[in-house]
Amino acid sequence: MIAQLVIAFYFIVCVGIILINCFTEIISRCRSCVLKRREQRYCEEYRQLFLENIAENKKQEKRLVKELHSTSRLLTFSEALYKVENSMPEQFQQGIASVSRLMEELIPVYERKSDMEKACLAYVFAIFHMTKFQAKEIVFPFLFDLLGNKSLYCRENALRALYSSEDIHAVMQALTFLDANEQLLPHEKILADGLLSFDKKEELIPLLWKKMSEFHPTMQVSLLD
């Protein structure tokens, strides 16, 4: 009799665990679907905002900046920009300059956030080449601070953003800084890819050759490879 009660109790516990797991999985999937639909809605809203020229509507501009204080919204906004860039490249080129300058307002906010969130902002700056439209005195201090960060993700995205600025002197300053702090050097592929994609490489290469003998072997190998 006792054995039967133990077996029955064990069976009930097992069934209960299975039901709880099933319920948890259903809730998780429902939540995931809701979040996905919400992100899709935000993405479409941001896409429309971009196409309507955000900078011409100060109320919308203020609301957007406030929303982009959230890193998840920032990444959703970047997804919207990516869609516009790929589907309507002309409209993207017409609007990206004003949006880039608007994004400068996020720097003081993200400076107080975690390293990963700071890196996300630098990543968005880099992939859309926003830094070439932004005020150097605002964006460069932020990026150079990230370049000296202990987080590799911060350093790599900061360097990408500096490359995308098309500012030769900023790139040379970044490479010189990394050479003087070899422990901060990102993967050599990041260094090489940045040089290959740099729009003003014809002007940059002579400066690099002039400086090459002063660089440490590690930096020399990274640049020459």
Predicted features, each with a name:
Residues K113-D115, K150-L152, E182-L185, F215-P217:
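Short inter-helical turns and helix N-cap capping residues of alpha-solenoid HEAT/ARM repeat scaffolds
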Residues M1-Q40:
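N-terminal signal-anchor transmembrane alpha helix of single-pass membrane proteins
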Residues T24-D115, F125:
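N-terminal topogenic membrane-targeting module
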Residues E61-K66, A97-Y110, F133-L146, D167-D179, ...:
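Amphipathic alpha-helical scaffolding segments comprising HEAT/armadillo-like alpha-solenoid repeats
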Residues R47, L51, S78, I107-E111, ...:
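Amphipathic alpha-helical repeat scaffolds
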Residues Q48-E56, K83, I127-M130, S164-D167, ...:
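Positions within ordered alpha-helical repeat solenoids
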Residues E79, S87-A97, A119-T131, E156-E166, ...:
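Structural detector for internal amphipathic alpha-helices that build alpha-solenoid repeat scaffolds
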Residues F23, L147-G148, R155-E156, R160-E188, ...:
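Long, contiguous interaction/recruitment modules in multidomain scaffold/adaptor proteins
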